[in-house]
Amino acid sequence: MQRSPLEKASVVSKLFFSWTRPILKKGYRQRLELSDIYHISSSDSADNLSEKLEREWDRELASKKNPKLINALRRCFFWRFMFYGIILYLGEVTKAVQPLLLGRIIASYDPDNKVERSIAIYLGIGLCLLFIVRTLLLHPAIFGLHHIGMQMRIAMFSLIYKKTLKLSSRVLDKISIGQLVSLLSNNLNKFDEGLALAHFVWIAPLQVTLLMGLLWELLQAFTFCGLAFLVVLAFLQAGLGKMMMKYRDQRAGKINERLVITSEIIENIQSVKAYCWEEAMEKIIENLRQTELKLTRKAAYVRYLNSSAFFFSGFFVVFLSVLPYALLKGIILRKIFTTISFCIVLRMAVTRQFPWAVQTWYDSLGAINKIQDFLQKQEYKTLEYNLTTTDVVMENVTAYWEEGFSKLFEKAKENNNNRKISNGDNNLFFSNLLLGAPVLKDISFKIERGQLMAVAGSTGAGKTSLLMMIMGELEPSEGKIKHSGRISFCSQYSWIMPGTIKDNIIFGVSYDEYRYRSVIKACQLEEDISKFAEKDNIVLGEGGITLSGGQRARISLARAVYKDADLYLLDSPFGYLDVLTEKEIFESCVCKLMANKTRILVTSKMEHLKQADKILILHEGSIYFYGTFSELQNQRPDFSSKLMGCDTFDQFTAERRNSIITETLRRFSLEGDTSVSWNETKKPSFKQTGEFGEKRKNSILNSINSKRKFSVAQKTSLQMNGIEETSDEPLERKLSLVPHSEPGEGILPRSNAVNSGPTFLGGRRQSVLNLMTCSSVNQGQSIHRKTATSTRKMSLAPQASLAEIDIYSRRLSQDTGLEISEEINEEDLRDCFFDDVENIPAVTTWNTYLRYITVHKSLMFVLIWCLVVFLAEVAASLVVLCLFPKILFQDKGNSTKSANNSYAVIITSTSSYYIFYIYVGVADTLLALGLFRGLPLVHTLITVSKTLHHKMLQSVLQAPMSTLNTLKTGGILNRFSKDIAVLDDLLPLTIFDFVQLLLIVIGAVVVVSVLQPYIFLATVPVIAAFILLRAYFLHTSQQLKQLESEGRSPIFTHLVTSLKGLWTLRAFGRQPYFETLFHKALNLHTANWFLYLSTLRWFQMRIEMIFVIFFIAVTFISILTTGEGEGRVGIILTLAMNIMGTLQWAVNSSIDVDSLMRSVSRVFKFIDMPTEDGKPNNSFRPSKDSQLSKVMIIENQHVKKDDIWPSGGQMTVKDLTAKYIDGGNAILENISFSISPGQRVGLLGRTGSGKSTLLLAFLRLLNTKGEIQIDGVSWDSITLQQWRKAFGVIPQKVFIFSGTFRKNLDPYGQWSDQEIWKVADEVGLRSVIEQFPGKLDFVLVDGGCVLSHGHKQLMCLARSVLSKAKILLLDEPSAHLDPITYQIIRRTLKQAFADCTVILSEHRIEAMLECQRFLVIEENKVRQYDSIQRMLSEKSLFRQAISPADRLKLLPQRNSSRQKSRSNIAALKEETEEEVQETKL
């Protein structure tokens, strides 16, 4: 950034905004970059403004019981606000004085008033000076008010952000991210844009009073006729506005539904393509779009009539004021023209300025009250710590996630008793809600310094809540907690802040090379970092999108380990790691590097429990066991079933198993929701073996019993707006649907329907607490890999054993939150936060306009029709101008003039001009009303928007993943939200206003030129100056606006990033650092916005200066050349005064049109994306039948094999190479292998080795080379749809879109209810679906928020069964599954896919044991592909990954594989207690 010229600018330069000339010149000649923008002044700095307002707000909180934020704002900004308001009032007063001088000039041409004729020239000079004074007063005042509004917004932005970092977790659980974004975008933008109008709430009444007094002198009591009409018109416009808002509110719901579905499709585009659902998704969105457009048209018609009413009101107010007076008393031309000028000013004050001012105050006060309520919410309370304490002690602690639960519990219980909803077991009813019970009950333990305590338990047992209570996030209601307070924390869901890898690990702590390298080595990050060209200085944006899930997890762990603390809280840090990496990190990092530190590790792995000093097992919030591992084996031999949350599944009967499935899944389904967190109450049930059978959990479905959603605090569903854990698309990409700018978006669009946050059916929004608990879900494999040669980097860490060193032996210097932030400049912020820079011209090209016009044939005809109507109106005006004087006043000498004439209108030789002016008013009214062209134009433009949306949707759905991988999800969503909103709402009426204003100006110029040809000579250079000035300004303004839009994205992205890592921020005490970073983002946006406001005011001032010159020329030409024509002078000057506002309005509208057309350019850019090649090749022929329709039928054993393809599922892969993006590095190279029909193949490899990539390559979702054949048919010889239908897919990223169960299972409607129920029963979903009202017709929203991750995996499994595919691809199907669902999936795979080829990528050892062959991927290549017995007999990755006990389990399979000629799936023996222990939860 550069130093601002404003600092050294003179008073004159500031007054005329001349200091912006350098940036305007540079923007016209070249493309502006962020470095070209000027630094802001200290008075606009977010630090200073926030400190100022925070000081006044604290003063307000301390001095009053009912603090008011508006009082704090008043003390900060009131006097400057009033100063500019007075200047604005003086500028508006000049408008009221101008008609007086106009009347005097007209009167000077009265033949009976020879005296004033001599001073006409001085009156003309006075009139011109009034315009000059108005220009010099108005623009600085408006700019000053915009500046104050900007400062108020900045101060409140900062205040809200600081408050957000202090909010308690209980409050965050009740606030949606959409509400926070809306608070920062929708509400606070009102200060920027509306503060200049706020003063008109008192200026407009004063101005109306002054004007009515002046009009009284001319028309006496008849003045109130015109005022009454304006008041009625104002109420009419208010009614039309209310009607328009009703349509918009109705449409907002439809827009929201469309955007929710669109967002889900974009986030899950890989799944959509894998399922071949493009056409089904397109049909769903187009149906919603059709309903939306009906309401859009209604709102546009009403808004069009409202806009037209303002234009034609000018004629009627003059007519109603002048006509009664003229009929009774007669009138002279001076009064007519003076009245016209007064009425124009009066119309603006009554119908525009005052209503807008009232609306501004209403919106602003509403926003202030919302912010005030937010600032008074409960804050996070830091626990009292004793720094000298070395142990961690918890004594009889009980805690609730929610306060005041008793009333809610009783109410819900009463409602539930009335409903008596069955859960599938006739002996049980959901009579208890998950309310009232504490999340932790009577917890006591003690950990000595240097000990490792492992915390285990079933899902929802309270493990994460225990850590939150130690950190102070969960306040205990009973008991005591003692520790030193020096805590380090690693979240279960890895959180990456914007910045480099090094910044993420150091995290504001002083840098120490020795410690840093040791941590890097212990966390197995050396090899990963060496692959990046920038090493650990690579900038990570959007939550670490360029990293795999395992890499993010290790960076989060390294951050926790690097900090020197007394207590380390590690919440399931190994969830995304492969078995070997997990084992190495646990031994080298947790056990050796941190050997002298106190550690609490949440885990369920038996190896971890064996090495822990203490073990704490939680069950339903209570301590099930506390002690050592040997004590655990002696005292609790049944502990493994408690870890699982169930007894041996196979021991139950089918009926009892189904009941357990229902109850367990229902328990997990509640964990996916995001409102208030409760633990579960239990009720005795039927008898069954084991302790688990003694009690069963009962619950009420959220969607049935209450509009308010209840959830437990420990979430395993990991849901954020319905998007599940993934290795494909990161969660942040959806959340950059912020106002981009945008969604997300970024992240969210600027339209009101989106900025408020997606509101799903039932009014449910995603809470901030849930956002925090799934901060890195969906962040899986990298899609933008910048890897160098994969040579392992030499370790810089000490070569001694990690057990022999102590990296914490010396205390580093005092941690500082400013150390890193001072090094972060604007370019770093751009790399971390900004969306990709749009590659579109600074000014909309003519090609874009031409292409837009030709999108729909009817638009061209409508534009031609508009031109024909205008030419007819101009021709009629010229005819009237020529014929009226001849027809009405053939005898000029017979005309007389007297003040006491009995005629209503004094007949003079100049009265013909008065009649002509009335006709011009009527013509302009017809032009404004536009009944024969306005409505068709608006209607057609909306139709064009419909066509563009349809084409863009088709283009996105048909685009290859290699193209979509280069785009950010928020950017794609912005096209369907913000840009389509522009095409629907703003562009049609803006084009209409511009065309209308342009024709009015042209008509007025023609009339004036005909009356006085010399004026035409002055008009030509003025119009040329306008065009040149517009072109000069437009290049810079559009670039500044784009930079401002880009600068808005970091603000909202940083807010979301901070919320997702809030627990980590508090644990590390990095709030000041993040506040500083937020202020830098605010300052960056302020620099762009302030410069845009300044250049805009420069342009507006030059426009008025050019007009002042034009008006001076018109005035003196009229006075010096008109002669005795009193009417001629009046009409020329009156039209000239009207041209000023209209022409300036037209120029501004043209700029708005150009700005809005940039949305059209972006839409065209998406429409022009390449498409996937779906054309069949003639080389493909079915073996038995040549009909292509039969090839499209994908069946399995239920249809004769002679009629279908594929028939067996044999796969042959030859030299397969795969890339994610064009020109990127190959993720897989020269992969070759073959799979026999019905064989089960397991994929092995470290995290990020390319296992998921191989599955995507099978589906042709990547840039691939080579060949794959299925049953002898090559993928190049059939269409993509045919190829992908050969596969059944269970992706790692589960896709549940907003719709019914039936639509989610069968979007094309191919299967009957009987078939769907059969499959649902087969996969264990029947009892779950039957719980919901409507059953298959129950509408799932928010990505299936009432379903657990296990439910959703079963939905995917049901889809695969329905597809009857012969090849099944499974990508981490057991990730984050509860044990019951995992058992169901395994059994369904054995039964429904017994004869199918199965390719499995899995981290669970027991799942991999069922495979006959294994494919080992390492360094982008196949390292080994062999049978189980060969893999176990050799030194291989598979042998290293499994324990000796697991190898023994494989003996039956090894023997059976030797005896069988075919590699069919071996029958699995029943689960044993030992297998259960190894299950990873």
UniProtKB/Swiss-Prot annotation:
Protein keywords: ATP-binding, Cell membrane, Chloride, Chloride channel, Endoplasmic reticulum, Endosome, Glycoprotein, Ion channel, Ion transport, Isomerase, Isopeptide bond, Lipoprotein, Membrane, Nucleotide-binding, Nucleus, Palmitate, Phosphoprotein, Repeat, Transmembrane, Transmembrane helix, Transport, Ubl conjugation
Gene3D superfamilies: ABC transporter type 1, transmembrane domain, P-loop containing nucleotide triphosphate hydrolases
Region: Interaction with GORASP2, residue numbers: 1387-1481
Name of protein: Cystic fibrosis transmembrane conductance regulator
PROSITE patterns assigned to the protein according to its UniProt record, in alphabetical order: ABC_TM1F (PS50929), ABC_TRANSPORTER_1 (PS00211), ABC_TRANSPORTER_2 (PS50893)
Record's compositionally biased regions (Acidic residues): 1471-1481
Residues the entry annotates as binding ATP 1: W401, G457, S458, T459, G460, A461, G462, K463, T464, Q492
Known function: Epithelial ion channel that plays an important role in the regulation of epithelial ion and water transport and fluid homeostasis. Mediates the transport of chloride ions across the cell membrane. Possesses an intrinsic ATPase activity and utilizes ATP to gate its channel; the passive flow of anions through the channel is gated by cycles of ATP binding and hydrolysis by the ATP-binding domains. The ion channel is also permeable to HCO(3)(-); selectivity depends on the extracellular chloride concentration.
Compositionally biased intervals (Low complexity): 1453-1464
Any matching Pfam family: ABC_membrane
UniProt cross-references to NCBIfam families, sorted A to Z: CFTR_protein (TIGR01271)
Biological classification of the source: Eukaryota, Metazoa, Chordata, Craniata, Vertebrata
Naturally occurring in which organism (per UniProt): Muntiacus muntjak (Barking deer)
